[in-house]
From Swiss-Prot:
Keywords: Ribonucleoprotein, Ribosomal protein
InterPro entries reported for this sequence: Ribosomal_bL28 (IPR026569), Ribosomal_bL28/bL31-like_sf (IPR034704), Ribosomal_bL28_bact-type (IPR001383), Ribosomal_bL28_sf (IPR037147)
Entry keyword Ribosomal protein: yes
The family this protein is said to belong to: Belongs to the bacterial ribosomal protein bL28 family.
Protein name: Large ribosomal subunit protein bL28
Gene: rpmB
SUPFAM superfamilies: L28p-like
Amino acid sequence: MPRICPILDKRPTRGRKIIRKGKAKKKGGIGLHTTGNTPRLFLPNLRNKKVYVPELAKKVSLRISARALKTLMKKGTYTILKEKGLI
């Protein structure tokens, strides 16, 4: 199952985790130094939700991001799902 939100097309993005060592100058140290730079994936916040669609009079099971859930509630479930071709 792909880690993609079907409504907003959010997908995993690549980034890096930067590891720092030392004491900050503001706290009396000589400054932070970067000691590592590890590649990683930032995953979308996907949730399994059952959303009620009044026009169809039934619940639809979706795997959507938390941001997409807010969009559904704001613009209406039927219009968004119809626009994206999910129903």
